[in-house]
C-alpha cells in the first residue's frame, strides 16, 4: 500500500478558518473512495455542530464557497414578514432594494443564547437568530467598511458601526423561546405592540466606553423591518460637527454621544431616524437660541411638551449636556434663520 499525502493539506486562510483540501489529496490504494467518504463525513460533522459561544460562531464564519451558497435576496416582497435589504449590497447598484424571507434567514448559521440583560425582556429569555456580522459578510458590498442600520416600522433607527458589531456581536433575532413572532411577548413600554417581525439583541452587553455620563449603550430595537448596509464614513460624516468649533473637545464628545443616542430618532437630511419629527437643525437652533430649553428637552422632553414620546435622559450631568449643546451649536450660524424654542412641537 502506497500512500502519498504530499498534496493533502489543511490550509488556514486569512480570517482564521480551516478548510480541508480533499480534491488534491492522492490516496493510491484500492480503498481510496471509502477514505475520502470518511474524511468528508468528518468535515461535515465538524461544520454542522452548533457553535457554543459568540467567538466560536465567528470562527465558524463561512468560507467563499459557503457565501456563494447563501440564499439569493429576492426582487419582490413575498410576505409582510420579509426582511427588506437596501444600501450598498454586494453585486448590486447602491440603493437597490431586495428581500429575504424568514425561511431564507433560517438557512443561515444560527446561534442561540439565554439573555438576562436586555430591557425588552422581563426575565431571562432564550433567543436565536443570525449574527449581524454574518449578514454583513454575506450581503455588504464592502464588509470591512460598511455599517448596518436597522430601521423599524415607526422610523426609529439603530446604528451598528463596524467597531460596535465587533465588540458586542449583535444578533438579528428570529425566535424567542423557540417561538416565531406570533408567540413573542409584547413591547416593554406599552405591552400592546408586537415586537416582530424582527428585533436585535446581544448575548451579553458590557459597555465599551463612557463619555461623561453617557455610557456605550445597547442598541436593541424591536419592530425591525429593514436593514441598510451603508458606508460608515458617509453616514457618520453627515453629522460631523461643522465650523470653527468643530474640533473642540466638547463638540467632539457631543458628536460621539449623538451617534449613539440622537441619531436614532432625529435626522439630518436622509441620515438618521424620523420618529421624533424634529430634524437636526431644529435641535441646533434650540441649542443656539436657548441652551436651557435644549437642556430641559434632552433631560425631560415631557416638561416642554406633555405629548412628547422621546424618553428622557435624567441621568445626564452638566458636562454631558454641555457637550451636546456645543456639538449641536456647530450646525447653526447667526445668518441662518432656524425655528426657535417657541415653535409648537409635534408629539
What residue ranges belong to the model's regions?
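Structured, non-membrane catalytic/scaffold regions adjacent to prosthetic-group chemistry
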Residues: 70-232
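Bacterial N-terminal signal peptides
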Residues: 37-43
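Axial heme c-ligation environment in periplasmic c-type cytochrome domains
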Residues: 275-282, 299-331, 335-344
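Bacterial Sec-dependent signal peptides at the C-terminal "C-region" and cleavage site
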Residues: 45-64, 68
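Gly/Gly-Pro-rich "capping" loops immediately C-terminal to redox-active cysteine motifs
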Residues: 255, 263, 267-297
Amino acid at each position: 500500500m502506497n500512500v502519498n499525502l504530499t498534496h493533502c493539506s489543511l490550509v488556514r486562510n486569512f480570517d482564521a478558518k480551516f478548510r480541508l483540501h480533499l480534491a488534491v489529496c492522492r490516496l493510491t490504494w484500492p480503498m481510496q473512495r471509502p477514505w475520502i467518504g470518511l474524511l468528508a463525513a468528518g468535515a461535515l460533522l465538524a461544520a454542522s455542530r452548533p457553535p457554543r459561544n459568540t467567538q466560536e460562531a465567528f470562527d465558524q464564519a463561512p468560507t467563499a464557497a459557503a457565501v456563494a451558497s447563501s440564499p439569493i435576496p429576492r426582487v419582490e416582497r413575498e410576505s409582510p414578514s420579509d426582511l427588506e435589504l437596501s444600501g450598498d449590497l454586494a453585486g448590486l447598484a447602491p440603493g437597490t432594494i431586495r428581500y429575504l424571507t424568514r425561511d431564507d434567514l433560517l438557512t443561515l448559521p444560527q446561534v442561540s443564547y439565554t439573555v438576562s440583560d436586555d430591557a425588552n425582556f422581563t426575565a431571562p429569555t432564550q433567543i436565536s437568530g443570525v449574527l449581524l456580522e454574518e449578514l454583513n459578510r454575506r450581503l455588504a458590498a464592502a464588509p470591512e467598511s460598511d455599517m448596518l442600520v436597522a430601521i423599524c416600522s415607526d422610523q426609529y433607527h439603530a446604528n451598528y458601526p463596524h467597531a460596535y458589531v465587533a465588540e458586542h456581536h449583535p444578533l438579528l433575532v428570529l425566535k424567542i423561546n423557540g417561538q416565531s413572532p406570533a408567540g413573542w411577548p409584547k413591547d416593554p413600554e406599552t405591552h400592546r405592540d408586537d415586537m416582530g417581525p424582527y428585533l436585535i439583541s446581544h448575548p451579553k452587553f458590557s459597555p465599551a466606553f463612557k463619555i461623561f455620563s453617557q455610557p456605550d449603550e445597547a442598541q436593541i430595537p424591536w419592530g425591525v423591518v429593514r436593514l441598510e448596509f451603508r458606508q460608515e464614513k458617509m453616514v457618520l460624516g453627515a453629522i460631523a460637527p461643522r465650523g470653527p468649533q468643530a474640533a473642540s473637545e466638547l463638540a467632539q464628545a457631543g458628536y460621539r454621544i449623538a451617534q449613539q443616542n440622537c441619531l436614532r430618532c432625529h435626522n439630518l437630511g436622509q441620515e438618521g431616524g424620523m420618529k421624533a419629527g424634529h430634524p437636526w437643525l431644529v435641535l441646533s437652533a434650540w441649542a443656539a437660541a436657548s441652551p436651557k430649553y435644549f437642556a430641559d428637552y434632552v433631560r425631560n422632553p415631557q416638561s416642554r411638551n406633555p405629548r412628547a414620546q422621546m424618553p428622557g435622559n435624567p441621568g445626564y450631568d452638566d458636562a454631558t449636556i454641555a457637550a451636546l449643546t456645543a456639538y449641536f451649536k456647530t450646525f447653526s450660524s447667526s445668518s441662518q434663520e432656524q425655528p426657535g424654542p417657541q415653535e409648537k412641537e409635534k408629539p
